[in-house]
Amino acid sequence: IPSAILETLSHQNFPDMRLGHDPNFKFALARAVYKSILRFMCNQHRTVATVTPLAPSYFHINYLYNGQIKLGWRETNDELEPTAKPTGYILYTAVDSAGFDNGRLVKQNEIELSLHPYSTYHFKVAAVNGGGESFTTETLSAYYQPEATNTILVVDGFDRLSSPAVIDTQQLQGFDLNEDL
């Protein structure tokens, strides 16, 4: 079985540890390792490497009328990898407390759906291509109540990942795991 040990950061080097705690750096490093392994394996088997696309972005729900909604999202372009372009999307749906279904393939970046009254619908989307399936978007939910006189909008303002707060003084260097940047 082929194996490797990847030494990427030193726990004795504070700048390295700042990177090691950064979720965005962790993702970039993991994706770079994945691409390297993929290219190596494809080269060994004389096949063309197709990199899995990045997760869609700007996922949103627009309420249209009488239980009709439109889900939409944008392709996330991987500027470093032209083969990571999605060829479609998988829309996963869960109703009330049930788990998500196996998904349905959607070729465009939007879809209109009808909601049954008094049920809570949960949606998430993944991008797909010949290389596989991306991570999913965050989960968005919708509820249709025919007697409603107003529409409620809930905005998810959480749009970033953060490392723990950095402590870097003359006396101390480290991280406050109870605070973030």
Task: Describe each model-derived feature in a short phrase.
Residues R39-T83, P117, G131-N150:
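Pro/Thr/Ser/Gly-rich low-complexity, intrinsically disordered linker/stalk tracts
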Residues D101-Q108:
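Short beta-strand segments within Ig-like beta-sandwich modules, predominantly Fibronectin type-III
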